[in-house]
């Protein structure tokens, strides 16, 4: 099936060069309706889902008058319709409002492929290689709809052409994912066919602790922190914030649920450190001795010097529910120069040393410049445009790194 789609896309490019778009329109409709019928409607199709997805395109007109008939230029209105395979209301194979090519591609992505997402806590060595200290893989499922991750039970909304890979139980799945100073969180989403004959990376991204902490500090209001301290702990603040991690070259994004690791105080900037062996601060010790350094602008690299990535934007933009913290440059680029960053092991020693428990001590630590602490980093979802997934599956097929 994948080979047939790739060959048809190649023929389409050739036809455009020879005689334009309209020359073989009927042939293309025949091909895509045949593909839809053969691979999704036939009952013998292996491991076939019971649902069928149709992409319907209608011409909608704007209310402003600009044309001869008082209507603005037509714009396509896209709807995703879902039917059971044995439904008597299935659109006919000759329905002109159905985009048969996109319907085939959508059903391919939703039904014919498996997806595995891996989240890892890593550091970068002097040579540019990534060292994985902890990772967790989880199977996810593609969906043309989405729902807010910060409020359970809300109704899903159609997100097509953006495809979402959501982890509803993200707090349980990534419960032990903590990141500290000098470390970064890396995310990789891999697609494979049902027989596992091929694998291809469709998303890679990373975000440094420093970027996560900066966003976290900005989002947690000073008023909430002070209210917690002045009320001697009676005011409970929910300190989970949602941070977006952009993909390379702006290809999709992932969302992280970020919260502070408990240190014995429920405030967002609590000062009561817990030195119990059960504390998450004792869960692991990083194995590197040299701190990472700022990225080099001349040659991107992620394990392999042959990888090429556009240098992304480095701006941080405010979001209402999600905050975009980076463009995932750390996952693909080498480091260079001398950074004024402390060794990651210092975080553990500082966190376990303990400070005063009084209100005065809280006030001093609130205003302390060097206030690093461990953060939970829970992956909530990855989202990508459908056409970018298709390109990676049919043409690029980049080999996975975190899963190896």
Curated annotation (Swiss-Prot):
* Record keywords: Phosphoprotein
What's one Pfam family the UniProt record gives for this protein?
A: DUF2045
List, alphabetically, the InterPro entries matched: DUF2045
Q: Where is this region: Disordered?
A: 261-307, 320-340
Q: Compositional bias (Basic and acidic residues) spans? A: 320-336
Residues carrying Phosphothreonine:
290, 293
On this chain, the residues bearing Phosphoserine are 267, 276, 279, 304, 306, 324, 358, 362
Q: What is this protein called?
A: Uncharacterized protein KIAA0930
């Amino acid at each position: 099936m994948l080979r047939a789609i790739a060959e048809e896309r190649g023929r389409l490019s050739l036809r455009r060069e020879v005689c334009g778009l309209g020359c073989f329109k009927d042939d293309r409709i025949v091909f895509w309706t045949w593909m839809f019928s053969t691979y999704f409607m036939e009952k013998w199709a292996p491991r076939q889902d019971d649902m069928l997805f149709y992409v319907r395109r209608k011409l909608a007109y704007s209310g402003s008058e600009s044309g001869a008939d008082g209507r603005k230029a037509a714009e396509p209105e896209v709807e995703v319709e879902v039917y059971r395979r044995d439904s008597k209301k299935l659109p006919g194979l000759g329905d002109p409002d159905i985009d048969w090519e996109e319907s085939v591609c959508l059903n391919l992505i939703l039904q014919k492929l498996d997806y595995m997402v891996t989240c890892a806590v890593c550091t970068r060595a002097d040579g540019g290689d990534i060292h994985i200290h902890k990772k967790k893989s989880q199977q996810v499922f593609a969906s043309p709809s989405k729902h807010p991750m910060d409020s359970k039970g809300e109704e899903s909304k159609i997100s097509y052409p953006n495809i979402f890979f959501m982890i509803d139980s993200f707090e349980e799945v990534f419960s032990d994912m903590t990141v500290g100073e000098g470390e970064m969180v890396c995310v990789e989403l891999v697609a494979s066919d049902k027989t596992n004959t091929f694998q291809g990376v469709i998303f890679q991204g990373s975000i440094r602790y420093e970027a996560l902490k900066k966003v976290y500090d900005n989002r947690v209001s000073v008023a909430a922190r002070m209210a917690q301290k002045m009320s001697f702990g009676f005011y409970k603040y929910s300190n989970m914030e949602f941070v977006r991690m952009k993909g390379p070259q702006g290809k999709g994004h992932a969302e992280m649920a970020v919260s502070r690791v408990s240190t014995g105080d429920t405030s967002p900037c609590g000062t009561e450190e817990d030195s119990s062996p059960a504390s998450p601060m004792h869960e692991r010790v990083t194995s590197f001795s040299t701190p990472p350094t700022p990225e080099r602008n001349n040659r991107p690299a992620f394990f392999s010097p042959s990888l090429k990535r556009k240098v992304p934007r480095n701006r941080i933009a405010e979001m209402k529910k999600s905050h975009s913290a980076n463009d995932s440059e750390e996952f693909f680029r080498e480091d260079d120069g001398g950074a004024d960053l402390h060794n990651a092991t210092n975080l553990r020693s500082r966190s376990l040393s303990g400070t005063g428990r009084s209100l005065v001590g809280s006030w001093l630590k609130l205003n302390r410049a060097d206030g690093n602490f461990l953060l939970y980093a829970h992956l909530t979802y990855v989202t990508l445009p459908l056409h970018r997934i298709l390109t990676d599956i049919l043409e690029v097929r980049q080999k996975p790194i975190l899963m190896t």
